[in-house]
A protein has these predicted regions:
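Phosphate- and divalent-cation-binding pockets in alpha/beta enzyme and binding domains
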Residues: 187-188
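Bacterial Sec-dependent N-terminal signal peptides
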Residues: 1-26
């Protein structure tokens, strides 16, 4: 009996030790990731501890894709914590971060670990595109082309993202200003304009980067964008208190042409951010001389609360001087919707990258927004035509929905159309 109890005790102790060891290993494993995410929340971050922990974890378990993913992110943040330091990026650090994400893609072509923001393919695009832009800011065009090409060679700038952005640029009129949001739109456009010399007539304004000092100056000097602020003033512009007020833009050539709208606070209900002040100036200086677009589905606080004046033109929204009332004004389906396609995109290129699937589903949302507006006006014939067009161009076996909830949301509207279609 004692022997039996001793055996049970030994087994229990071994099990407890095994569980404790596993728990300790898990804590150690997660601590690097935890430390990185902890620092990422701070205004002034120090990623040195996360770097030490994650470097050690990669040495102990080099085939763990998640360790490498977060080590790559940590190295990138050590290179430049945000867009403010982007123009000072170092090539050596970019290469080291890139090597980690490249290994992630080799170990897991479809990454299964936790994502921080971008998937590994999109992050490769981001870090190499940022280095290229830093070179462009220093007027090193050949170095910028090298960085873009190197990024593509190492696994970034995948074709689905590039093709989406080609068609987004194609949606804009000549000499347009396009206000964009996020790395998956802005950086691939930089690539297309620099490497493929595609739609270089368009000036891209990234609404996030414009909060930095260097980017506004770069747009003035290198992209020939009219901004009334001097460089000295740009150095001093900050966020400020703001109450909702009417903004009026006057055509300098024909002063009888005026456009007014209400600009509300863009931050915390009583402030306007530095970037929004500069974006407002860009709008005032260029509205009557160049067409201005926002990429589709932009939030009102990002587009200076111009939403009522935006006309849906597929992947982009054009700013007009007239409020469009979807309850009364006739919806005109943009010709752009008849031209979009993903014929050049391979299915495996979409499914291996979460961000590619999300970006390309922007095509579906462009069609769906028009279908929704047509349904509100009981124009079921046109809505049915558009649904068929979307289904033919973007089949689910090639471009999956990003979630079951989104697919069901679409299906509910489509059923409403089928029910009323004659």
């Amino acid at each position: 009996m004692r022997t039996f109890i001793s055996i049970i005790s030994l087994l229990f102790s071994t099990l407890c030790f095994s569980q404790a060891t596993t728990t300790v290993e898990t804590v150690i494993v997660d601590s690097g990731k935890y430390e990185f995410k902890l620092q990422a929340k701070k205004d002034t971050a120090d990623y040195s501890k996360a770097f030490r922990i994650l470097t050690n974890q990669v040495k102990l378990n080099p085939k763990n894709a998640e360790y490498r993913y977060f080590l790559g992110y940590t190295i990138d943040r050590l290179n430049a914590d945000d867009g403010k330091g982007m123009f000072q990026l170092k090539k050596e650090m970019t290469v080291k971060a890139s090597e980690q994400f490249e290994e992630v893609n080799r170990l897991e072509p479809v990454y299964k670990g936790e994502l921080f923001i971008l998937d590994p393919y999109a992050k490769l695009t981001s870090i190499w595109g940022s280095l290229a832009e830093a070179y462009l800011n220093r007027r090193l065009a050949d170095s910028a082309k090298w960085a873009f090409s190197e990024g593509k060679k190492r696994g970034g700038f995948i074709e689905p993202i590039l093709e989406f952005n080609r068609q987004l640029l194609k949606s804009c009129d000549k000499n347009a200003i396009l206000v964009t949001y996020g790395d998956n739109i802005t950086i691939p456009i930089w690539y297309l304009q620099t490497i493929e010399n595609y739609r270089t007539d368009i000036t891209v304004v990234d609404a996030n980067l414009i909060n930095t000092i260097w980017y506004s100056k770069y747009l003035k000097s290198e992209r020939n964008l009219k901004i009334s602020f001097s460089d000295a003033v740009i150095d001093t512009i900050e966020y400020k208190e703001w109450q909702s007020q009417q903004i009026t833009v006057i055509n300098s050539i024909d002063t009888t042409q005026k456009f007014s709208w209400e600009l509300r606070p863009t931050y915390l209900d009583n402030y306007i951010l530095k970037g929004d002040r500069i974006l407002l100036d860009i709008f005032q200086q260029n509205f009557y001389s160049r067409p201005i677009y926002f990429n589709n589905n932009s939030d009102s606080s990002y587009n200076l609360f111009l939403t009522p004046y935006l006309v849906d033109e597929g992947l982009v929204n054009r700013v007009t001087t007239k409020i469009f009332d979807y309850s009364t004004d006739v919806v005109t389906v943009s010709k752009n919707l008849y031209n979009y396609n993903i014929d050049k995109v391979q299915k495996e290129d979409i499914t291996k990258s979460r961000d590619a699937a999300i970006v390309l589903n922007g095509f579906r949302w462009a069609y769906f927004n028009n279908v929704y507006h047509l349904v509100t006006q009981a124009n079921y014939d046109k809505a049915k035509e558009l649904i068929k067009l979307m289904g033919d161009k973007f089949k689910t076996d090639k471009l999956p929905f990003t979630s079951i909830e989104v697919e069901k949301y679409f299906a509910d509207i489509f059923q409403q159309v089928d029910k009323n279609y004659r």
